[in-house]
């Protein structure tokens, strides 16, 4: 006989969510694979036109006309659907936090078509749009199934996970991204549904693009232990450069707002500036995966590496600041690869065997992304899956940890959270539904909730703690129920109050804040 006050977790609930996750993953895999394929084909075509224009300049005039028309078209899309601006990841985070509301179908088709800005050669990535496309599909599935708000958010999460998985053939990174970057917690139903969706979407993507890893660099030798000390120095460099990236990216509106153009036509700037870049250096166009892949065959001269880094840093900022649909994942990884190649070449001058330069390319990609996104687990696993090698988990972890600490000491914040805060400050279309909803709140090791009775905590108003998920059990709560580390608190509230209540519980349960009150 079961203990009083406990509800047995039925296996069919998990199966129910797994099946929904598979459904979302299948649709997302198809849509994102078509999106990715369209961008690649368009990118190849654009590069070939620039190559031809060197001998027949009339083609450059044609490209200029196409860029102007594309800027008009994408600007019109952004004007009618502002939620497709940028990578889309801050919008998804805001949606899951209950701070933004979106029309999933409008976002889906306009974001897909708006991807022309990525295919046109701008220094933007496909991963952010892929995540938002997946999230839109998840939201649509939730409405199709007439799911309650809390279940719809799980499906949105699974869509985001499967979007990243299909974009990079990285299902584990897709799962970790949702848990580490978006939810900042571990919820059994979220990870189970998201994992099912990510695996399914990745299978579809592999069918389209084959089994070869996206950034396969060939055989990568294991880095000898004697070079691990140099990883600390590399981590410091990555942390500092990541902090600079954050500051410059967040300062871009100060530049664009001075232009005599409406915000939705800021894309004219990158669309016009891409013309001389495409004419002079067509191989540098796009998110940068071709540059990373080039390191698998040969090492570039240091002066060329520095030139490429400056070019890609500056124009990736200009591209993203224009408010066009496009992400920063791949551009960040490309910049990290250039930093790693530069550092590896310096190490060769100090006597290191050149065969290890590729190791530093891989390590720096993860470290630089960690410094900017403040999501080390996602960065490590993402790079591991993209290069197809498990030989570098230890050096990846070391460099990522140092880069994270250095960026933290400098005062850097996770870039997507900063972008979301800016979006919420400027967003005029955000709408709160005001519907009843539940959300999960984890009890962590650094929380004062650990070991506390429910009645002894000063809970916010307008909420109800309805149950606690502990392992596979769901416990109905009462005043004497003791909360423990690892518990997931299931809280009922109105969606309009959700962000405030989350923040209030976090503030009141923080050990740091508790100590400061004494």
Each PLM stretch: what is its role?
Residues 415-438, 510-518:
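Long, charged amphipathic helices and adjacent flexible linkers at domain junctions
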Residues 439-443:
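Short, glycine/charged-rich beta-strand-loop motifs at protein surfaces that mediate ligand recognition
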Residues 361, 372-373, 433-435, 459-460, ...:
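A structural signal for short secondary-structure junctions
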Residues 86, 112, 435, 459-462:
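A short, polar/charged loop/turn motif at coil->beta-strand junctions and beta-hairpin connectors
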């Amino acid at each position: 006989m079961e203990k009083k006050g406990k509800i047995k977790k039925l296996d069919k609930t998990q199966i129910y969510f797994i099946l929904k996750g598979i459904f979302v993953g299948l649709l997302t895999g198809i849509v994102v694979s078509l999106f990715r394929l369209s961008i690649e084909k368009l990118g190849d075509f654009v590069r070939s036109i620039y190559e031809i224009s060197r001998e027949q300049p009339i083609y450059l005039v044609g490209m200029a006309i196409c860029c102007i028309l594309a800027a008009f078209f994408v600007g019109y899309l952004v004007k009618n659907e502002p939620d497709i601006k940028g990578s889309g990841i801050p919008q998804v985070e805001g949606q899951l936090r209950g701070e933004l509301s979106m029309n999933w179908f409008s976002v889906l088709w306009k974001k897909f078509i708006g991807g022309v800005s990525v295919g046109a050669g701008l220094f933007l990535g496909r991963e952010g749009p892929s995540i938002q496309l997946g999230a839109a599909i998840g939201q649509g599935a939730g409405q199709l199934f007439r799911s309650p708000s809390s279940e719809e958010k799980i499906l949105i999460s699974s869509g985001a996970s499967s979007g990243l998985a299909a974009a990079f053939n990285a299902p584990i990174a897709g799962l970790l991204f949702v848990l580490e970057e978006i939810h900042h917690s571990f919820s059994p139903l979220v990870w189970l549904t998201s994992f099912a969706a990510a695996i399914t979407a990745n299978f579809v993507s592999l069918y389209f693009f084959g089994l070869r890893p996206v950034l396969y660099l060939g055989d990568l030798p294991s880095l000898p232990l004697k070079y691990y000390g140099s990883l600390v120095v590399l981590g410091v460099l990555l942390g500092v450069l990541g902090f600079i990236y954050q500051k410059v990216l967040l300062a871009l509106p100060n530049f664009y707002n001075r232009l005599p153009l409406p915000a939705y036509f800021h894309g004219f700037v990158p669309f016009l500036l891409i013309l001389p870049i495409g004419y002079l250096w067509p191989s540098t166009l796009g998110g940068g995966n071709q540059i990373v892949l080039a390191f698998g065959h040969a090492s570039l001269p240091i002066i060329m590496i520095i030139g490429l880094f400056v070019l890609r840093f500056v124009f990736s900022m200009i591209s993203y600041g224009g408010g066009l649909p496009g992400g920063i994942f791949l551009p960040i990884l490309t910049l990290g690869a250039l930093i790693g190649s530069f550092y590896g070449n310096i190490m060769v001058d100090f006597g290191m065997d050149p065969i290890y330069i590729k190791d530093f390319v891989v390590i720096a990609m993860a470290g630089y992304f960690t410094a900017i996104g403040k999501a080390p687990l996602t960065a490590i696993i993402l790079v591991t899956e993209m290069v197809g090698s498990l030989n570098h988990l230890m050096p990846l972890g070391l460099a990522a940890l140092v880069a994270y600490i250095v960026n933290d000491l400098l005062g850097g914040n996770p870039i997507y959270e900063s972008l979301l805060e800016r979006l919420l400050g400027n967003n005029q279309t955000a709408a709160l539904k005001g519907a009843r909803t539940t959300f999960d709140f984890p009890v962590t090791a650094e929380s004062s909730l650990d070991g506390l009775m429910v009645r002894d905590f000063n809970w916010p108003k307008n909420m109800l703690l309805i149950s606690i998920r502990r392992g596979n059990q769901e416990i109905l709560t009462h005043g004497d129920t003791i909360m423990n580390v690892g518990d997931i608190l299931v809280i009922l509230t109105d969606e309009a109050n959700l962000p405030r209540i989350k923040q209030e519980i976090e503030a009141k349960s923080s050990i740091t804040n508790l100590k400061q009150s004494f």
